[in-house]
Structures are given as C-alpha cells and as structure tokens.
C-alpha cells in the first residue's frame, strides 16, 4: 500500500484484488476512498511518485525500487507476516486491520476443455520449473515467492478466494459494468 493524505487510490485494474483491498480499506476506515483504475501498476506508481495520485494498492514487486530509493513510502503490506522483500514495512494486521490480510497469488489457467493429461503435464512442468536454480531469485525481484502445488491445491485456493472475496465484492457494489 502506498499512501498520501488525499482519499483516492489507484489499482492496476478495476476488479482486481488491489481494487477490492483498497475499497475494503476505505469501508473499514470509514472514509470515501475513491478508486482510480489504471491499466497496470507502472502508470499508477509513477503518478504516486509524481504527486498526481494520492495512493496506490498494488503488488509490492511493482514499487520496491521506488520505496528503497525513497521516492515513496510504503505504509503497509497485506500478508499474514512481513514481506521478506520489505521487512521494514509493517502489515495491516500489525497496525490494527487484520481484515485487510490478503496473500495475493498467481496461477496458470487453460481453457475448460483442455484434456486432463495436458493439464497434468503442464502442472508437472510448472512445478519442476519453480524448483530450478535462479527461479526463486528471479521471482523475488518481482516480489514473488514460488509455491507450486497440485491441481487440487489450485482448485481449493480458487474456491477459498471466491468464498473470501464474493461477499466483499457484493458489499462494495462492484459489477463488471461498474
């Protein structure tokens, strides 16, 4: 989370986890926190650094360099524990907002009719790639930690995310048209 004093925030896209996290933060803080959707994180981070956007909610790999260079201040991370990439930045939970704990994740998806053997082979290849030397370091530059896992793990994660975010999306009144 990047923040100035104005009550607006950017996110990399409408309907993204950062969009909903910012909206939830505004609701929990009792402020009218206006969303400014961007097409990706880079333009929003540039606007925070340039002073034309008050704050940005985005994956931390998108702003670590600006934080370390002192061009912006990161006030919180949303993980369960402090990020190994930003150990000086407290979590929302540490600051009294445990409901803002979110572990953002990325997955690989294929069309619904992709044969099961192709999905299984892709899953094996991805898990093997994540174990290769240098992959963790490369992902770390982006602020990511490789996890890997089974197809069942991914299905459980998707359901858990749906169960978590569904009520929040309804609470803030977001629709695909909004």
Outline where the language-model segments fall:
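Conserved, function-defining micro-sites of small-solute handling proteins
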Residues: 1-178
